[in-house]
Amino acid sequence: MPDTKKTFNSISRVYNLINNIISLGKHKKWKKRLVLGHAIKGNVLDIATGTGDIVYLIEEYWKESTLYATDPSNKMLEIAIKRNVKENVIFSESYCEDLHFNNSFFDFVTISFGIRNTKSINNALTECKRVMKKGATLKIMEFSKSENIFLSLLTTTYLFLIIPFIGLLFGKFKEYYYLSSSISNFYTPKQFEEILLDSGFKIKEIDTFNLGLVTIYTVTKP
């Protein structure tokens, strides 16, 4: 796996634009789906915050929360901080596997399209659980590997022909080929559910949508 900090620093300036292109603008609706349906009061952490899309949705819908956001890419964080006009979010640079927070600190944790890029998913989940209060919720949104052969073929074609080509147009072929590979190599919803259970979480809901290609996993710390 390449250094994710280096990869995301490299694509930080084109990240939002290319996200809109390759998702056909749908990623904004997906992220809103992650946030809606909750009224959170307390400490909230957005991991792998990137350029801050989830942060701004949380600010809009969870107005009584205290919001923290982390990412390993300092360049992505610079953009997120500039976009944060309310200046009420505590940003910090860290990997998911090494969060700089006390034990049992957060009431709610979110990770949007970031868990697959961790160096160790098991270590990342263990660290998430460490900083969560008992009964706290973790919501992870990630691309899913389809078990439908036809959809799997279409997805593979899109991942390894279309997305890297779009990256190439912006001079970022290597970075977007890696991101396509990380999507292709991720788990089916059932496989990732087992990983979450093995990490000690309690499954609350698994919501798969967009033809089974995106899944939101809602789990709690017992």
Feature locations, PLM:
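A short acidic, Gly/Pro-enriched loop at the edge of an enzyme's catalytic core
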Residues: 97-108
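A short glycine-rich, Lys/Arg-flanked "PGG" loop and its adjoining helix->strand segment in the class I
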Residues: 122-137
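A short SAM/SAH-binding and catalytic strip from SAM-dependent methyltransferases
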Residues: 107-120
